[in-house]
Amino acid sequence: IGSWKSKYNVFCLDERTDHHRKLFNNSTFTHLMIVVENLYKSFDGVNVLNDISTTFEKGKTNLIIGQSGSGKTVLLKSILGLFNIDKGNIYFGNQSIQNISNKERSILRQEMGMVFQGSALFDSMTVEENIMFPMRMLTKNSFEEMQSRANQVIKRVNLINANKKLPSEISGGMQKRVAIARAIVMNPKYLFCDEPNSGLDPKTSTIIDNLIHEITQEFQITTVINTHDMNSVMEIGEKIIF
């Protein structure tokens, strides 16, 4: 366990040290990461998150690992602002999401990319149209500008021959590539992945893991992956939280 910890930089969710506070108080670091401080969340009186503190660093593949029911999805959704927390703070850089206006929250959400467990693609849209969708909703770019940007990320995730196909016409692994491309098309600062290997065979899982890891390093994104897959941990985990 000791050598595994030293290799992968592992933190327990209930580990209480001064490490997180020192990083949080250092202005050199705070713009590079997500900081979770003393987080509590309960449902119907049952504590799911109990005094959680940790950090997710820029340019690293940060993995939250745990069994079903361990609270990892609640933590991820709390960071995304999908759950109202009971107590504590979540910071994106120096900005606490507990004390921001609706306008600031909207801007922050545009800096986030999300890869959902089931890919969540639009069945009636082509690969290219799925990837263009966030730009259509959130920008005033021309169709030509959106198409050009979509084709850039299509090329980056190796889908150049599938851009005019429907999701039903491509494999599960290719669908996951579409989801990743859609998540990064707006040049996000933060990338969140919920069980990105769900339903994939081991070989394809490794390919998807490596693609996410490469994109994280290439664009210096703060990437947070929610997983129970130990192969992902061994393959790409730079910081592991369990």
Regions from the PLM with identified roles:
Residues 166-170, 174:
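Conserved ABC ATPase signature
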Residues 185-189:
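A short, proline-enriched helix->beta-strand linker immediately N-terminal to the Walker B motif
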Residues 191-194:
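Catalytic Walker B motif of ABC-type/P-loop ATPase nucleotide-binding domains
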Residues 227-228:
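H-loop/switch region of ABC-family ATPase nucleotide-binding domains
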Residues 80:
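Helix-to-loop junction immediately C-terminal to a conserved catalytic motif
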Residues 143-161:
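Conserved ABC ATPase "signature" region
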Residues 202-204:
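Helix N-cap at the start of a conserved alpha-helix in ABC-type nucleotide-binding domains
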